[in-house]
Structure formats: C-alpha cells, structure tokens
C-alpha cells in the first residue's frame, strides 16, 4: 500500500525523515519495502519550459507539418517542427527541450535533435497527454497570454514533490490499511521513543443537516451480512474537476483523479480505511435503499461493463426495482454519479468480511473496497467518515445536506475485553518490562485500561483491532512497539537437545538425491500446490474430473490442487525464458493430489482423496554452451534418461530388475515408463508435446521426468547395501557392430545381453548409431560395447569368444541382428 509522507504528517506530528519513518514502521511490524520521491505529475515536468511561438510556416515537404521558431526565454529562438493542427504564431506553449524525458504510462522516451522531412527540429511542442496533465491529444497546449517564456513548466503548474512509502500490510492488520491507521502505529512508536507527538484527525463537529428535501429510506434485510449501514443525501451538487490539492493527494499515491465527488470517496478510503460509495440519488427508484440478496442467476452489469450472474449469497445494494451495487465489492454501471448528477446519496457501511470475501472471489474481483471489507474495517468509524464526506462534498461540489443520517445498526460493535498479566508478558517476551512502560504502550495503541492490579491489567481493545482478542495478541503488540531489538539475548539458553532419534529414511534419501542433482547443475524450485484447473481441460492423462477443487479459491489461477508437478515447472521455465535464461535444469519434490469419485464413502469423507509425493525433473536448452573448447550442444532426452538412471542407482535399485515400456500421450510426444516387475509405476520421462509447450509460450524442447517417490521408497525397502573387494583381475571389452531393424531399441539389446551372461557381463553401452547410405531400407547400425570381468580369474580368449558367440546367436534369433 502506498503511503504519502506529507499526508501522514497531517495526522501525527514528527520530525523524522522519510527513510527514518520507513525504518520506524518496519521495526513495529509494518514492513516498508522502499521510499520513492514522487511528483504530482510523473517526471516532475523536468526539462519542460514555457515558450512563445514567434513564427509558424508550412513545411515544404508535408501537407500537415509546420516549421516554427519558439522563444524559450534564453536568447536565440529555437526551431521546432510541429504536427499539431492548432499551432500558430503568437501562442504561449509548453516545450520539451533536448534531453527531456516524457512518459507514456510505464514507457519513457527522450527528446533528441532530429530531422523531420529534411528540416531540423530541436525539441517538441507538447499536448496535454504527452506531459501528463490531461488526456487530450487533439492539439498542443495553448496557455494564457500572461504566461512568461522561459518559465519552468514545473513552476507554472505548481508541481508538488512528496515521498511514497511502500508499506506491506499483512492480512491481520486491517486497521493499518489507511494513512490514519499507519499514523496510529507511528504515534505509538514516537511515544515509546520519548518523542513529543499528537494524533489528530479532522473534526466533523460542523456537520449539520440543512433541510429534509431529499429523504431516502434505508432498509437492511440481511443484518448478518450487513451489521451496519448508514447514508445521507446532498442535494444540488455540481460534479466537476477536483481542486488541485485533492488531485495531488491522489496522484501521489498512484490514483487517477476522476471528479470531485468520486475523488472525495477515494480520499476517505485511503485516509481512514472506510470505503464509501456515491449513488446518483435520482436513480434510486422508489426513494429507498434496500440491502438484500438477489435470486440465483440474476444478471447485474458492473462499472466495468461486464454482465455478471449473481449468487444467492451475494449481498446487493438495491432500490425498489433494481440492484445498484455489489455490496462492499463493486458498483453498478447505471447507479453511480456522473457529470450530470445533481443529487447524491453517500453510503458508509460495515459489511461482514466473510460475505465480502466470498463474493469477491466468486466474481474474480479485487477492489480497494473489498480489500478492506474482507479483512475487517472499523465498524465505529462509519458515521465519522460519512459526516466528513458529506461536509467535503458540500465544500467542493456545493449543495446542501438534505437528510438526516440514516444509520441502521443491528448492535453497536463492542470492545474486546482482554485480561493481561505481567507474568505472561515477561514469559512470552523473555524480558521484564516495567509496568509503566506496558501501560504507556497499550494506551498509545488506544487500548483502554478498565482495571489495574499488581498482577496485571484488564484492557478494552477497540473493535478495529480484529487481530487483538487474546492476551498473547496484546503481548505481541507490546513487543513490536517496545522494539524487538530492545530484547537482549540472555546469557544462558535453556533447551532440550538429543542426538538420538529415528531418522526418516525417505527424507535422508531425498536430501542425498537433491545434493546429487545440484551437483549435476540442477536448481531446486518450489511451486504452489494450488494451480489453474484450466491446465487440465481436455487431458486424458490427468482428467479434470480427478481434480481436487477448492470451494473458495483465492483466484481463478489458484482454484484446484495440482495432479502433476509438470505445469509448475513449465511456468518456471517460461518465466526464466522471458528473462533471457533459456538453458535450465530444474527439480522439485512435492505432493500431487487426486480425486476419485468412485471411492466416495458417506462414512469416510476423505476416501475419494489421495496424495502422492513426486520428484519432477525438467531439462531444456543447451547442454554445452559455445566456447573455445566446445560448440553449442543442445540437451536431449538421453541426458534426462541418464539423470533418472543415476537416481535409481543412488537409491540402490538394480536397473536390470526394472521393466521399461513405451508411452505416448497428451503430455509426452515420446516417452518411456519404468515399472517394477510387479507393475508399479516408478517413473515416466520423455519429450513434452509441442501443444503443451505452446500453452506456456515455451519455444525450446522440454524434457520432463516424473518419479513417484512413494513407490520408489517401497521398491527400495528390500535393498541392502553390500560391500565387496575390488577385482584384482582385468576387465575385457568387446565391440559388436549390429545391423538391426529400425524399430529395435537399445534397451532390447541390453536386456538380451544381461539374460545371456548374468555373471561376467558388467556393462553394456551404445557408442554409435548409424542410419543412411550403404544400409538396407528399414535398417540401422548399432555399435555396442560389452564389458566382461571375472572376480576370481583372468578371462582368456576362449572364454570370451564363447560368451560373445552365444550373445551374437541370441541377438540373431530374437532380434534378427546381423554382424556388420
């Protein structure tokens, strides 16, 4: 949330610099990410000056350009080519000089000397939208005749500077979602640190009802969802541009001024955290505001022009005939104030956080109002803010306050009563804090001391502190204001440590595999278990019907639990690729979740749900980057296969005991599965389909492996580590060049080889593949190396030849192989 330094000073007096304020707020739990100097107009109009057009003639090479000379108040006139249709001699204009930076949203461009259709142009005569003082681009700005050439534009437009503090508000601190809320905490900090400070806010004592010419009735039909609703009317207003001071306040914190009435409501919400809504009173049919729910499926068009279907639990603000606003979330298209509005009805309410949160999530909306209502605002500030808003409307838009405040309140919000003992304060904080200091802190935080004893205090905590309802909550507040850095580390630490205990084998092996992968150049990633259900639309390998859906998702992008780690990794790859980092190796350990409707059991609610622990590997980009020693070499699925095999070896699995099969589905264009002999799937790895990559805007090939960690742990239960002496006898290598059908895979050769010679054959490796000229159609050549070794003697040629002859015969019989 953006907090204005100068605005903050209106509520609490201090002599701290912006950086000191940021440090103070961070120290008391309102973490401030940064301090930025800003101006009411982006860029501060630096480099812009007022000029006078001395001459203006048509460009010889254009039918719409003009060549002008402009007096910038610095002596010699400046030549500028201008394309605006309204440029003329004698005008006072705004000129961007060489080197000036102009902003278009987040983009910036610099004014440079240029030639336009062969004529030199030194600068630019500007339109409103080009310098950020308006939205018109119909022509250049023409200033009044009394504008003085050479005057800096920032002085002419009275550009103000301020500092914006980026305060990160945690979900429990709804009370700090405003300038006044932050000022309250800063005031407590100042008092604790011995500084003279006072907390103030504008008085509304001057509020007075002038007549009863526009009386609008208020009815609340659902007091659970709306415990308090208040409204007042102002008649005879003029909707127009806000005064400069109000526009500047909003611009500084990043808001765009709209008109005086709307700007007042935005000012109030950012000043005091109370969302307001302004209705055109003449559009309230029947002269009554009704707070209620609507039938399921009712359509309603919001301010953004989107037609939405309402849920029966969406609280609505209605008139006698129509819905006007989604309560606490978003206004309607046809009920708000416009430039033609003359009478307004101002709403100030307290809506139940849960109702607002669920409605906002259902419609995928996140507004300034819903952000505050769903966290819980101060129910007792509604009337104050309503009075202040009405007074401001009267002052800035004219008119008269034309009704009594209609305040429908089921029951006034009560303070939270908390019993606090000094002993517990000392126990939780770890330091004895004097009672007077504790009383000073709680008082500065607007907690009332209802009773006091030698043992502690009875406190009344204001209802806007929704996060402080227990003694431990109060103690946390005491600690953050007292200062975490003021609690010394004790000279002795009491702890209970043991060096004995059960070691989780799975965790230990996970760490070993993680270290192995990191050593191979992988980076570990951690993705959210929540993901987007749309990823699974139309998939057969991971059907949408098996998704574990969230009843109340944070957003449409986080509305289900993941069935696979794949999509999170592809998001990470896309994120890195967009930042010019395309050579990637990722791994992730995480749970995957599954729903099976066939397992539903009324007596076991969780029966249809399951989760498995998986390891995902992603490889993409180059395996070797271009250098003096190596040319570029792209990674391949075989590299991924090696990583998978090495993981199996690290876990102690015998690769020859596993069953490998082919796979091609909507995830992989080509892949292999690795199963136990009992049919349990241990891993799948292969090439991700182009269609899948396109959905994530990934251009490079991606190779993905999915290892079921749970099944791997089961598979290695019987694995035992054995040790043996290194053989004293040499190993012998024999190579074969085999002519085979193209459909034959190396895995088949490997399997036959190990079945043929189980004792002496130690390794089978493929070192060359050839397909092309001089081979029969449909054939390919494999060059395969066989490593033989006897642990008890040196192998002689006769023994080796016997093994190789048997091996060749089996390859010929089973695969139709021929020696080349």
From Swiss-Prot:
Q: Which GO terms describe its molecular function?
A: ATP binding; magnesium ion binding; phenylalanine-tRNA ligase activity; tRNA binding
Which residues does the annotation say bind Mg(2+)?
A: 467, 473, 476-477
Q: What is its EC number?
A: 6.1.1.20
- Primary location class: cytoplasm
Q: Does the keyword DNA damage apply?
A: no
Q: Which residues form the B5 domain?
A: 413-489
Q: Supply the SMART domains for this chain.
A: B3_4 (SM00873), B5 (SM00874), FDX-ACB (SM00896)
Q: Name one GO biological process term.
A: phenylalanyl-tRNA aminoacylation
Entries under InterPro entries matching the protein: aa-tRNA-synth_II/BPL/LPL, B3/B4_tRNA-bd, DNA-bd_dom_put_sf, Fdx_antiC-bd, Fdx_antiC-bd_sf, NA-bd_OB-fold, Phe-tRNA-ligase_IIc_bsu, Phe-tRNA-ligase_IIc_bsu_bact
* Recorded GO CC terms: phenylalanine-tRNA ligase complex
- Can the keyword Membrane be found in this entry's annotation? no
Which prosthetic group or cofactor does it need? Mg(2+)
Q: What class of enzyme is it?
A: ligase
Which UniProt keyword terms apply here?
Answer: Aminoacyl-tRNA synthetase, ATP-binding, Cytoplasm, Ligase, Magnesium, Metal-binding, Nucleotide-binding, Protein biosynthesis, RNA-binding, tRNA-binding
* PANTHER family in UniProt: PHENYLALANINE--TRNA LIGASE BETA SUBUNIT, PHENYLALANYL-TRNA SYNTHETASE BETA CHAIN AND LEUCINE-RICH REPEAT-CONTAINING PROTEIN 47
**Which NCBIfam families does the record match to this protein?**
pheT_bact (TIGR00472), YtpR (NF045760)
Name the family the entry cites: Belongs to the phenylalanyl-tRNA synthetase beta subunit family. Type 1 subfamily.
Q: How does it assemble?
A: Tetramer of two alpha and two beta subunits.
The name on file for this protein is Phenylalanine--tRNA ligase beta subunit
Tell me which species this is from.
Bacteroides fragilis (strain YCH46)
